[in-house]
């Protein structure tokens, strides 16, 4: 008796369905976690900092995998450039007459990053995790004189950042909102001044009470 052609497909579907179901549930849970962590910028970057420290300690302890470290540093630099660069290059807008601003209000547009902060964080964190896993495979430990890679990366970093800074000054944009640190500084200063005033007021209230008590003692005498 020959098996029906559809029986094998049904069996494969039955076997694969639990795995596919688990994959879908894991994907939803992970995406839910990412969505909930989006507002917590400081906590997210602290996690990335911990991952970076663990990776650096791993490379330092085994004293190897310098090519992987060079690739990781170059990739992080590329992400940083995307994070600091505008989504639309002003140089290309200047060459296109159709994209020129019609009125003066269009000249001051909000800075939109080519790579948003959340995507920058996610890609950087994933890069550190992947690089850490790669350090457990000995065939990836290519022998190389690491000071050459370090010098080459420093030169690459200097040239890239110099070009980016010149581009910022030329087209008059700044990738950070300076108003938020100023508001935070004002809040901290006002909080300290309010605390000092309250403390001074408490001290002033204590002085009359002490003087009144001394006058009462004199009257009793």
Curated annotation (Swiss-Prot):
Name the job this protein performs: Involved in the retrieval of endoplasmic reticulum membrane proteins from the early Golgi compartment.
Organism, per UniProt? Answer: Arabidopsis thaliana (Mouse-ear cress)
Q: How does it sit in the membrane?
A: Multi-pass membrane protein
Q: Where are the stretches annotated Disordered? A: 200-221
Where is the protein found, in the record's own terms? Answer: Membrane
Top-level taxon in the UniProt lineage: Eukaryota
Q: Which family does it belong to?
A: Belongs to the RER1 family.
Which stretches are tagged as biased composition: Polar residues?
209-221
Report keywords, A-Z: Membrane, Transmembrane, Transmembrane helix
Q: What's a Pfam family in this record?
A: Rer1
Q: What is this protein's name?
A: Protein RER1D
Q: What Gene Ontology terms describe where this protein resides (cellular component)?
A: cytoplasm; intracellular membrane-bounded organelle; membrane
Residue spans crossing the bilayer = 41-58, 64-84, 128-148, 149-169
